[in-house]
UniProtKB/Swiss-Prot annotation:
Keywords: Cytoplasm, Phosphoprotein, Phosphotransferase system, Sugar transport, Transcription, Transcription regulation, Transport. This is Phosphocarrier protein HPr. Signal peptide: none annotated. PROSITE patterns: PTS_HPR_DOM, PTS_HPR_HIS, PTS_HPR_SER. The modification Phosphoserine is found at residue 46. Gene3D superfamilies: HPr-like. PANTHER family: PHOSPHOCARRIER PROTEIN HPR, PHOSPHOCARRIER PROTEIN NPR. General (non sugar-specific) component of the phosphoenolpyruvate-dependent sugar phosphotransferase system (sugar PTS). This major carbohydrate active-transport system catalyzes the phosphorylation of incoming sugar substrates concomitantly with their translocation across the cell membrane. The phosphoryl group from phosphoenolpyruvate (PEP) is transferred to the phosphoryl carrier protein HPr by enzyme I. Phospho-HPr then transfers it to the PTS EIIA domain. P-Ser-HPr interacts with the catabolite control protein A (CcpA), forming a complex that binds to DNA at the catabolite response elements cre, operator sites preceding a large number of catabolite-regulated genes. Thus, P-Ser-HPr is a corepressor in carbon catabolite repression (CCR), a mechanism that allows bacteria to coordinate and optimize the utilization of available carbon sources. P-Ser-HPr also plays a role in inducer exclusion, in which it probably interacts with several non-PTS permeases and inhibits their transport activity. CDD domains: PTS-HPr_like. Residues 1-87 form the HPr domain. Coiled coil: none annotated. It is found in: Cytoplasm.
């Protein structure tokens, strides 16, 4: 399992557009990928799950990936987050 914690820097947090960016990127990998925030974990491939967390700017989130391409998945998701989540 690979995991990493990130601070969300996008002004509006993870709303519809950033959530779509994350879900689309996660969908490119076969690994199980979860997003954890405030003790709740959701499937990062589920737009409804990601949106339900209500992640705002400055929030600390943990991404966990488990599977054959977990390292690549975590790296790809990290790039999306560092690029500002499409904002």
């Amino acid at each position: 399992m690979a995991e990493k914690t990130f601070t969300i820097t996008a002004e509006t947090g993870i709303h519809a557009r950033p959530a779509t960016q994350l879900v689309n990127k996660a969908g490119q990998y076969s690994s199980e990928i979860t997003l954890e925030y405030k003790g709740k974990a959701v499937n990062l491939k589920s737009i409804m799950g990601v949106m339900s967390l209500g992640v705002g700017k400055g929030a600390q989130v943990t991404i966990k990936a488990e599977g054959s391409d977990e390292a690549e998945a975590l790296k790809g998701i990290e790039e999306v987050i560092k690029e500002g989540l499409g904002e």
